[in-house]
Amino acid sequence: MRVLGIETSCDETAAAIVERDDMGEGRILSNVVLSQIAEHEPYGGVVPEIAARAHVEALDRLVDRALNDAGLKLYEVDAVAATAGPGLIGGLIVGLMTAKALAMAAQKPFYAVNHLEGHALTARLTDGLPFPYLLLLVSGGHTQMVLVRGIGDYERLGTTIDDALGEAFDKTAKLLGLPYPGGPTVERMALQGDQKRFALPRPLKGEARLDFSFSGLKTAVRQTATELVPLTDQDVTDICASFQAAVADTLSDRVGRSLERFKTEFPDCATPSLVVAGGVAANKTLRAALENLCTRHGFAFIAPPLNLCTDNAAMIAWAGAERAATQAPDSLDIAPRSRWPLDEKSAPVFGTGRRGAKA
């Protein structure tokens, strides 16, 4: 089965075609991503209206390029999939409406994909990973520990009770006057700094629950920087290094407890695995810390290639292909959802508003 996937949930416009065979093995035929960093850089963050307009301008040509790169015509794909949430509602509408129109024009089945499910299933595309496994999803909008039992069968073990980790990286960069996007910049500066100079907190470290918290760490960074004004270049690199070390320690503690829980629930699992996905998973220091943690606990550490950690359409096409193997297509009247928890059975951490559960 060949599936055309479309991703427009935030500030990347993407289209891809993925093939899934009868044995469940996947192959990426094309994967095109257009970043909007240049459009949002002057504002220090993503502006939803600008993002939606950029998706409108770029998506048609990206779909054409994805088809051309795969050597296919639209009628030769077997299904169309698009991100329906969670994300910025304007961007979701652009991608969802485009995908519906293509599916209707080509008379192909349509699948509305949860963006988080795309991340959750990427390791099955790249590594053929069997169920069950643990997923650490770390991005600008989400920080979650998820038990993946099967397609559509997810249990949220822990989530952030305040800021997502990617947001904490971006806010730290902004506090220090570093350019957007903040995550890669903080990582690069940290390589030159002294991680022991500042004793920053490790939020929730040692607690039995599996949730995350990063707002206190972000506040500590702001207080440290304020006390040092005017900041020298060495101050900035040392703060970045101390911040990143605190994050690595916090993740190792939180994830380590999740690994122990997994072993208790699945004592007979032959190859227990931790999958790390999301944009923050591209951070090499954090990946190394988590890989060492997995080695100590007897887990396989699986991180998709860096270009599949950040937002892309290959993961959306693959999630659509996985669902198509066992589930009926979605109706074309399905609506986008700015909030769409991966595990809708769990109680929302932040409560429920008019638009649904927040996390």
Swiss-Prot record:
A Pfam family this chain is assigned to: TsaD
Main location: cytoplasm
Cystine connections: none
Positions of the UniProt region annotated as Disordered: 328-359
Swiss-Prot/TrEMBL keywords: Acyltransferase, Cytoplasm, Iron, Metal-binding, Transferase, tRNA processing
Cofactor(s) demanded: Fe(2+)
Family, as annotated: Belongs to the KAE1 / TsaD family.
Ligand binding (substrate): 137-141, 170, 183, 283
Ligand binding (Fe cation): 115, 119, 311
UniProt xrefs under CDD domains: ASKHA_NBD_TsaD_bac (cd24133)
Gene Ontology CC terms, in alphabetical order: cytoplasm
Enzyme Commission code: 2.3.1.234
Name this protein carries in UniProt: tRNA N6-adenosine threonylcarbamoyltransferase
The reaction(s) this protein catalyses: L-threonylcarbamoyladenylate + adenosine(37) in tRNA = N(6)-L-threonylcarbamoyladenosine(37) in tRNA + AMP + H(+)
GO MF entry, a single one: N(6)-L-threonylcarbamoyladenine synthase activity
GO biological process: tRNA threonylcarbamoyladenosine modification
